[in-house]
Structure formats: structure tokens, C-alpha cells
From Swiss-Prot:
The lineage of its organism: Eukaryota, Fungi, Dikarya, Ascomycota, Saccharomycotina. Keywords: Cell membrane, Cell wall, Glycoprotein, GPI-anchor, Lipoprotein, Membrane, Secreted, Signal. InterPro entries: CWI-Assembly_Regulator (IPR051648), Rcpt_L-dom_sf (IPR036941). GO terms for biological process: fungal-type cell wall organization. It comes from Saccharomyces cerevisiae (strain YJM789). It is a lipid-anchor; GPI-anchor. Glycans are attached at residues 57, 76, 83, 86, 196, 210, 228, 235, 242, 263, 268, 280, 292, 305, 329. Residues 420-444 form a propeptide. A lipid is attached at residue 419 (GPI-anchor amidated asparagine). This is Cell wall mannoprotein PST1. One of its GO terms (cellular component) is fungal-type cell wall. Its main location: membrane.
Length: 444
């Protein structure tokens, strides 16, 4: 009797184990979906809850009010939520990886999006989300990030991200702060037309290819050492720029129309590969903080009502110079001395203050003033005319050169044209929008 009981118990255990195995094997670890799979209701999303991995591209839209993608850990493809005008919240907190892109676009009443476990994605686009107040993720790896036309007050979903190709944040009018641990930016870091009190903090950033900041209130880049291409500050409410560890800018360095700017501190900056443009910063009376700058590979262009310009270590300007101040207290003596020693090359040298003007036609191949046989020097008592950059010029130029994934391939050709505009003979009239476009295009 005991033997029969033991045999029966063993048989029951084997049967249960086989049933469990059969049940487990019926749950697929990977589910292939069509390249254009769509979900318009929660029941459509529930079909994927038995899959660890989705292979394909999933688009969510329609009349969905709240949405959740449960249990899925990986998408080998893209996840797009588009034009779901009734959607108020979405969560995919098991999702860890998306091999292509995460796109949230044209979701007019979406208030929150939660991707709490998401660590890796190729690109993220948060575009036209006028009601969103919360975006959660644990992103550690992303190539491209675009955040545009949202109501986010802060960007907190990237606190673990260390490197990125493109980080573009624009037209988020409620934005007040961005703090990021990113260490390298291999393409471009751009912030434009966000809230006018936005504070930018990238204190771990060591190297970037391009940085462009517009309509920013304060910035902190405590450890930035090198800009491979260009750096631009245009139409900000910044009061000071402190980049004390920065030593090299590969192309253009522009500081334009920052009305509240009073102080510059670039004490370690020694080389600018392209143009240095400092124009129409009305509060910047004394231009200093460039004490160790020795070489400007392009044009030196400084325009405003400044009383002093301290470039005491400057040895070489390769693209000519145009320095114009409305103040009669500004002296051109230091720049004229540098030009006479052959330190300023290019097409022309112009230096004006409120009382006098000096203009020299240069030979771009000459090595010194003494070797020139056709140089003409003219002086007059006419007052310097200010080159004024308006907000309309700035926005028109910025609009013409805005970053988008579709225009990335053409940006290099536009940039080369922009550099040509910057390098035009300074003695000639340069259209303001053209100059600003050139500046902005060169830092994209």
C-alpha cells in the first residue's frame, strides 16, 4: 500500500513538472511584429505582455487614454507614440533597451511618460508635448536627444548619461534648468529659445564638438577643456561667462547680443582656430578675461560701446581685423602696434573709436608692414558706426540653421559657406543676417 502511494505521488509530481514546462515554453522570449505594427487600444498593447523582446517597429496612436507596455524588456526597432490626442499618461517601466528610436510626438494632453528601466536607446525625440510635466528614464547610452516644444520645467531623465552625439533642446518655454553629467558631445550641444530663466549646468563636460547657447540665463561648464569646432553665445541674459579650463576652440568663437553680460573669464584659452566675434553686448564695457589668447586663425571682429579690449598676449590674427567702438575712450594703439609688426594678416585692418578711425589695406601674403609696398593707411575723425544685430536677425539666422535629423547631412556644406562669409574682407559691408547665419552655422 505504501509502495502504491509512493508511485502515485511520484507520478503526480512528474505530471505537474511536465505541465509547468509546457506552460513556460508557451511564453515566447521574442516576438516578431510587422515593420509598421500599430496599437490604438490597451488591448493591443496587452498582446505583447507575454514577450520579453519585440522585433520590429511599434507605433501607438488612436484614442488611447492611458497606456502601458508591460513586461517587454527590449525592442529591436523603434517605439513611436504619435498623435494620440486623448493620451494622458504612458508607462513602459520594464523596458531596458530600444535599438532604434523612442519618439513621443504631437501628444497634446500627455502629462507624464515613464520609462524607469530604460538604459539604452539610439535616439530620443520628445516633440510637441505641450502638457507634459514629467519624463522618467535611466538612460545611460543615447546617441541623439531632441527635446522641442514641451512644457517640461527641468530635464531630469538623463542623469546617468555620460556621452552623446547630439543634445538639442529648443522652444521649451517653461524650462528653468538642465543639469547633466555628460562628459563628451561628439556632434553638437544646442539650447535655444527656451525659458528666459533657464540655467544650464554641464560641469562634467570635458570635450565637445560644437556648443551653441541662445536665450539662456546662466551657464556652468566647470571642467570644459576643448571645443573641437565652434562655441557661440547669442542673445542670452547671462551676466558672466566663466570657462577657466577651456584652452582650445577649433573654429569660430562668437559672443553676440548678450545685453546683460559684464564679465568674461577664459583665462586658459590660447588658440581660436577660426574667427573671434564679440558684438553688441551692451553691458560689456571692458572686454577682458582673454589674457592668454595668442592665436586667432580667422577674423577678429569686435563691435560695441566698450572702453577697453585686453588682448595683451595676442601674437597672430590670420584673417584680418575689424574693431569698432562707439566710445572715444577706447584706444587702438595696441592693435595698431600688432598690425605694424605683421601680427595681423588677411585682407584689411580696421580700428575705430568714437573720435577716429584707422583703416589699412593688407596683403594676405605679406609677413610684415615693412614688406608691403602698396599698403594704404587712412585716418579720419568721423565717428564709428555701430553694426547692430537685432533680435529679428538672430532669430532669422537661427531658424535658417536649426538642427534636425533630416538636415544633418547638409550642415557641413552650409557651414563652409558660413565660414566664407565670416572670412570676407572686413573692410567691405557684410549683411547682418548673413554674418549671424555664418556664425550659427559654423557652431552647428
Amino acid at each position: 500500500m505504501q509502495l502504491h502511494s509512493l508511485i502515485a505521488s511520484t507520478a503526480l509530481l512528474i505530471t505537474s513538472a511536465l505541465a509547468a514546462t509546457s506552460s513556460s515554453s508557451s511564453i515566447p522570449s521574442s516576438c516578431t511584429i510587422s515593420s509598421h505594427a500599430t496599437a490604438t487600444a490597451q488591448s493591443d498593447l496587452d498582446k505583447y505582455s507575454r514577450c520579453d523582446t519585440l522585433v520590429g517597429n511599434l507605433t501607438i496612436g488612436g484614442g488611447l487614454k492611458t497606456g502601458a507596455l508591460a513586461n517587454v524588456k527590449e525592442i529591436n526597432g523603434s517605439l513611436t507614440i504619435f498623435n494620440a490626442t486623448n493620451l494622458t499618461s504612458f508607462a513602459a517601466d520594464s523596458l531596458e533597451s530600444i535599438t532604434d528610436s523612442l519618439n513621443l510626438q504631437s501628444l497634446t494632453i500627455l502629462t507624464s511618460a515613464s520609462f524607469g528601466s530604460l538604459q539604452s536607446v539610439d535616439s530620443i525625440k520628445l516633440i510637441t508635448l505641450p502638457a507634459i510635466s514629467s519624463f522618467t528614464s535611466n538612460i545611460k547610452s543615447a546617441n541623439n536627444i531632441y527635446i522641442s516644444d514641451t512644457s517640461l520645467q527641468s530635464v531630469d531623465g538623463f542623469s546617468a548619461l555620460k556621452k552623446v552625439n547630439v543634445f538639442n533642446v529648443n522652444n521649451n518655454k517653461k524650462l528653468t534648468s538642465i543639469k547633466s553629467p555628460v562628459e563628451t558631445v561628439s556632434d553638437s550641444l544646442q539650447f535655444s529659445f527656451n525659458g528666459n530663466q533657464t540655467k544650464i549646468t554641464f560641469d562634467d563636460l570635458v570635450w565637445a564638438n560644437n556648443i551653441s547657447l541662445t536665450d539662456v540665463h546662466s551657464v556652468s561648464f566647470a571642467n570644459l577643456q576643448k571645443i573641437n569646432s565652434s562655441l557661440g553665445f547669442i542673445n542670452n541674459s547671462i551676466s558672466s561667462l566663466n570657462f577657466t579650463k577651456l584652452n582650445t576652440i577649433g573654429q569660430t568663437f562668437s559672443i553676440v547680443s548678450n545685453d546683460y553680460l559684464k564679465n568674461l573669464s577664459f583665462s586658459n584659452l590660447s588658440t581660436i582656430g577660426g574667427a573671434l566675434v564679440v558684438a553688441n553686448n551692451t553691458g560689456l564695457q571692458k572686454i577682458g578675461g582673454l589674457d592668454n589668447l595668442t592665436t586667432i586663425g580667422g577674423t577678429l571682429e569686435v563691435v560695441g560701446n566698450f572702453t577697453s579690449l585686453n588682448l595683451d598676449s595676442l601674437k597672430s590674427v590670420k584673417g584680418g581685423a575689424d574693431v569698432e567702438s562707439k566710445s572715444s575712450n577706447f584706444s587702438c594703439n595696441a592693435l595698431k602696434a600688432l598690425q605694424k609688426k605683421g601680427g595681423i594678416k588677411g585682407e584689411s585692418f580696421v580700428c575705430k573709436n568714437g573720435a577716429s578711425s584707422t583703416s589699412v589695406k593688407l596683403s594676405s601674403t605679406s609677413k610684415s608692414q615693412s614688406s608691403q609696398t602698396t599698403a594704404k593707411v587712412s585716418k579720419s575723425s568721423s565717428k564709428a558706426e555701430e553694426k547692430k544685430f537685432t533680435s529679428g536677425d538672430i532669430k532669422a539666422a537661427a531658424s535658417a540653421s536649426s538642427v534636425s535629423s533630416s538636415s544633418a547631412s547638409s550642415s557641413s556644406s552650409k557651414s563652409s559657406k558660413g565660414n566664407a562669409a565670416i572670412m570676407a574682407p572686413i573692410g567691405q559691408t557684410t549683411p547682418l543676417v548673413g554674418l549671424l547665419t555664418a556664425i550659427i552655422m559654423s557652431i552647428m
